[in-house]
Regions:
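C-terminal helical cap(s) of enzyme catalytic domains, especially alpha/beta-barrels
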Residues: 355-380
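Alpha/beta enzyme core
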Residues: 115-139, 146-155, 159, 165-168, ...
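N-terminal capping/small domains of soluble enzymes
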Residues: 27-159, 163
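Active-site clefts of carbohydrate-active enzymes
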Residues: 313-327
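Short, Lys/Arg-enriched N-terminal segments with co-localized hydrophobic residues
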Residues: 11-28
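Short acidic/histidine-rich active-site segments
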Residues: 348-355
Length: 381
């Protein structure tokens, strides 16, 4: 009798937890919540915008059946499709077509001290993975060493994206070149669902990086892993006294187009802040319609041009959350998520804003980002 009651109680708790998980997953951020956070003027600017550049009807938008609607006719093998699906089905955004990813590669890219001193527990690899799990992320993207250190404990609990190349920041004088830190085979051995890499498009070393990453992605696909490309413009000439064109829509858009050409499955890109890099720097080739018809100065339209360069959304665009600014982090993260979603993007990859604060605050920030993608009030522009 006692064993029977215990069994019923266990079943009750299991059903209750499943119900609670479903309820929390579909809590939606209301417009009034956004207005309170961003202020009415900025909220209206982002939420009321109707894009008249590239029509949303021309885009392949994120959806719960994106494997069938977008990827089934591609050359990706069955294992790669399964791993793309594994990422898409995990976390609070699982089954929506959108993704929320925690990236923590800054210990190499920016130095461990600069990255983790604000929140000392993050020196421990396990706490990085715990934040991604408790934060309801689709995946955790971090270094070869971090994931290798905890792979046996966590590879089956959250999809791993192993970042295989980095710009180490200890050489003097500092240089900007992405070099390989790990191997594709070992990423597969530790149970990774995907590998990630960075290319500095426009840099002196970019041609070598393109060849290296293209070969790495080919092997990753052969083994059945998905591929994520950090798609950054990088050249000292791109920054002028007037503007920083590293975040220009036309230059970042072309970086995206090069990235999908080497068969990245997901593109990570900085949110565009301006446009006209080609014209201001007087190099490369562009077209006047890029500026007169395909973009405006509205951030959603600039981001949509980035999406268009990802094969009109066939390859998902995730924008980065940027550096931590302190008290304004939550508002900035929510605004970035709104811009990405309304432009036709696939999600947000937010690191420093989340991991450079106590666990509960980091989880709350990640959940707020996810709430934007779950909200029916935040629509495609």
């Amino acid at each position: 009798m006692g064993e029977h009651c215990d069994g019923k109680m266990i079943l009750f708790h299991a059903v209750y937890l499943l119900f609670l998980h479903s309820l929390l997953k579909f809590l939606k951020m209301k417009r009034e919540d956004i207005e309170k956070l961003l202020g009415e003027e900025k909220a209206n600017y982002l939420l009321n915008h109707q894009s008249k550049t590239i029509s949303k009807d021309q885009l392949h938008l994120p959806n719960k059946k994106f494997i069938d609607t977008i990827w089934k006719d591609s050359n990706r093998n069955i294992q790669t499709l399964r791993n793309l699906s594994l990422i898409a089905e995990h976390g609070r955004l699982g089954g929506t077509g959108y993704v929320s990813i925690l990236p923590v590669d800054q210990g190499i890219e920016h130095s461990a001290g600069a990255s983790f001193a604000p929140n000392v527990p993050m020196f421990d690899p396990e706490n990085i993975v715990k934040l991604a799990i408790e934060g309801g992320c689709n995946a955790v993207a971090t270094t070869y060493g971090v994931l290798g250190n905890v792979a046996r404990k966590y590879a089956h609990k959250i999809p791993f994206i192993v970042k295989v190349n980095h710009n180490e920041f200890l050489s003097y004088p500092n240089s900007y070149d992405q070099i390989m830190f790990g191997t594709i085979r070992d990423a597969w051995n530790m149970g990774a669902a995907a590998v990630g890499a960075t290319i500095y498009f426009g840099s002196e070393e970019s041609k070598r990086q393109i060849v290296e990453v293209a070969k790495a992605f080919e092997y990753a696909h052969e083994l059945g892993m998905a591929t994520v490309l950090w798609c950054y413009a990088r050249n000292a000439a791109f920054k002028t006294p007037e503007k920083d064109y590293h975040v220009s829509a036309d230059l970042t858009g072309q970086a995206n187009h090069l990235g999908v050409t080497i068969q990245a499955d997901i593109i990570k890109q900085k949110l565009p802040e301006n446009n006209g890099g080609y014209n201001a720097l007087n190099f490369g080739k562009t077209h006047k319609k890029v500026y007169s018809e395909l973009t405006t100065d509205h951030p959603i339209d600039l981001c949509r041009y980035q999406v268009a360069n990802c094969y009109m959304g066939r390859v998902g665009l995730i924008n980065s959350g940027g550096a931590s600014s302190g008290a304004t982090d939550l508002a900035e993260a929510v605004a970035t998520a709104i811009i990405n979603k309304r432009a036709g993007g696939m999600g947000l990859i937010s690191g420093r804003k989340a991991f450079q604060r106590p666990l509960k605050e980091g989880v709350a920030l990640l959940n707020s980002i996810q709430d934007v993608y779950l909200s029916k009030e935040v629509t495609i522009a």
